[in-house]
Structures are given as C-alpha cells and as structure tokens.
C-alpha cells in the first residue's frame, strides 16, 4: 500500500467500473509519470463533461443540448423506438448503421438484488412518449443477460395491451453478454432478425 495522495488516487481509480486494483495502480503511475499538460487536459475534459453533459429530455441519451442529435434528426423514423438500457448502448446500435429510428434509454435494467425495480427505470417516460400515437413499433434491445431478459419481458407484457408491435433483438448476441461489446455485424444481424417480444 502506498501513502497519502498516491494511495488515494489508486483507491479512486479503483472505484471506476472495470478497473481492478492492478489497473488502478497502473493508471495512477501513468498519471504520475505523464506530462503535466496532458494531465491538465484530462482534468479539464472530465470537468467539462460533468458540467455540460446532461440527458436528452426526449430519449434520455447523453447530450450537451436539451435534445440529442438523434431526436433532432428529421431523417430518423419517429414511428420506431429502440429501447436500450444505457446511453453507451445507443452508440453500439448506431455503429451497426442498421437502425434509423429513435431511442429510449431506460437508465438500467430490472435487478431486484440491487434494488432496481421498474419504478427506478424510465418506463413511465416511455409510456408518455407512446401517448401521441405516432409510435408503431418498440424494439427491445436490452442486454442478453438475466436482468436484460427480465426487463424485456416486463416491457413486452406491459406494452402488449397498448396495441403496438413489440419486438426483441434476434439471437446471435451471447447470453450474459453486454450490448456495447457486440460487434457491428452481430448486432446488425440481431436487428434484421428481431422477433415478436412475446412468444
């Protein structure tokens, strides 16, 4: 264990998702050895993103404006909404270039162990978006893991009574995997082969 500021930096870096103790230590020493100007730019970038970035008032994707560029894009199909867990999943889907509709970011997935139920997700906001009648299809693109499947099943059952088409991405995505790590071809094929969400 190191002392003072070095250990504090390692501890803070270790709190980041996917960063274990060894990675935190490597990052801390990289920061210590890096050019001070590079580190000033990094600190500025982190501060700027925390000050400027917020959630789109329509879909809850990240943006620096009131609505994100996807919601503002008139070339996108407003009748189809792809429901994802997190903003990073929007980027994963966009990389496929297979989807030209709009999005809705739930802000997570149902996970009773972590105390996350439907009330903690942006499901109410999704239902509000459906009120105008313009939406004809909801594509559920939650992660193919236990929490993602629970969320997809909950949404499909809830939306069934509304009378819109509800589909789920096709297989090809590994069970237990994360959408953001799927390659573009696999994710693109999953969109093409999507199926009815309630079988």
UniProtKB/Swiss-Prot annotation:
GO BP, one annotated term: DNA recombination
Zinc finger (C4-type): 56-71
One family name in Pfam for this protein: RecR_C
Keyword list, A-Z: DNA damage, DNA recombination, DNA repair, Metal-binding, Zinc, Zinc-finger
Family: Belongs to the RecR family.
Chain's role: May play a role in DNA repair. It seems to be involved in an RecBC-independent recombinational process of DNA repair. It may act with RecF and RecO.
Listed name of the protein: Recombination protein RecR
Organism: Paenarthrobacter aurescens (strain TC1)
This protein's encoding gene: recR
